[in-house]
Swiss-Prot record:
It comes from Pseudomonas fluorescens (strain ATCC BAA-477 / NRRL B-23932 / Pf-5). GO terms for molecular function: ATP binding; ATP hydrolysis activity. It is found in: Cell inner membrane. ATP binds at residues 47-54. Belongs to the ABC transporter superfamily. Aliphatic sulfonates importer (TC 3.A.1.17.2) family. This is Aliphatic sulfonates import ATP-binding protein SsuB 2. It is a peripheral membrane protein. PROSITE patterns: ABC_TRANSPORTER_1, ABC_TRANSPORTER_2, SSUB. Its EC number is 7.6.2.14.
């Protein structure tokens, strides 16, 4: 492998979600979710706070177990593909006492440094390999987290609002980077986001979760690269926003304060 041209990864994982349910105590968060996601598709999941979208992602990542239903990678249990799955959070979660390149190669054995440098080059940070995380901006830290996922050659990339804390310009740059790497490598992507404009700008498909159920499943059939501010993109964004903001029989409520998750793990 050369530092100039990263290898094309294996094809993305096809996902099947069948009658998926998740209950916490007496509260049912997900209610018989059914989804089929072809290999290599880019799916964005949107919805109000507390609707169950992050719970869905945690189930796919294996951080929680479903109360009922099935999660499949093709015809096999999704748990069999756990080594091919990586998860990115809103915070990069870099170890401050390790240099950038060591954060990328965390947990790896053997001669991993050339691959780590290659992953950093793919996200535009090869020249920062020997720096400490404290010297990086928020966007650069998320690029390192993305490189840390790429070095494992994932077939399924799960993104839990990884761009939520970034400024507007950096957010757009990261969206474009993720889109470019997805096109190059062909992995399957599930992005959880509150930003509807982000969802329609980069996803093949936008899924709206309403009260633990799939309320909208919209295919975004627009050519890439997509023109931000175009009439067609704005129309799709409006369609999704109108659905999010006007749930039948449910007036808008203040967003609840979400408790801290009880179980987290890095995308290592």
């Amino acid at each position: 492998m050369t530092a100039q041209q990263p290898p094309r990864l294996l094809q993305g994982i096809p996902l099947a979600v069948r009658k998926l349910q998740k209950t916490f105590g007496s509260r049912q968060v997900l209610r018989e979710i059914d989804l089929h996601i072809p290999a290599g598709q880019f799916v964005a999941v949107v919805g109000r706070s507390g609707c169950g979208k992050s719970t869905l992602l945690r189930l796919l990542a294996g951080l929680d177990q479903p109360s009922a239903g099935e999660l499949l990678a093709g015809s096999a249990p999704l748990s069999a593909a756990i080594e091919d799955t990586r998860l990115m959070f809103q915070e990069a979660r870099l170890l401050p006492w390790k240099k950038v390149i060591d954060n990328v190669g965390l947990g790896l054995k053997g001669n991993w440094r050339p691959q780590a440098l290659q992953a950093l080059e793919a996200v535009g940070l090869a020249d920062r390999a020997q720096e400490w995380p404290a010297a990086l901006s928020g966007g650069q830290k998320q690029r390192v987290a993305l490189a840390r996922a790429l070095i494992h050659q994932p077939r399924l990339l799960l993104l839990d609002e990884p761009l939520g804390a970034l400024d507007a310009l950096t957010r757009i740059e990261m969206q474009q980077l993720i889109e470019r790497l997805w096109q190059q490598h062909g992995f399957t992507v599930l992005l959880v986001t509150h930003d509807v404009s982000e969802a329609v700008a980069i996803a093949d498909r936008v899924i709206l979760i309403e009260d633990g159920e799939v309320g909208l499943d919209l295919h975004v059939e627009l050519p890439r690269p997509r023109v931000r501010g175009s009439h067609r993109l704005a129309a799709l964004e409006t369609e999704v926003l109108n659905r999010v903001l006007s749930l039948p029989g449910s007036p808008p409520e203040p967003e609840p304060v979400s408790p801290l998750p009880t179980q987290l793990r890095w995308a290592l």
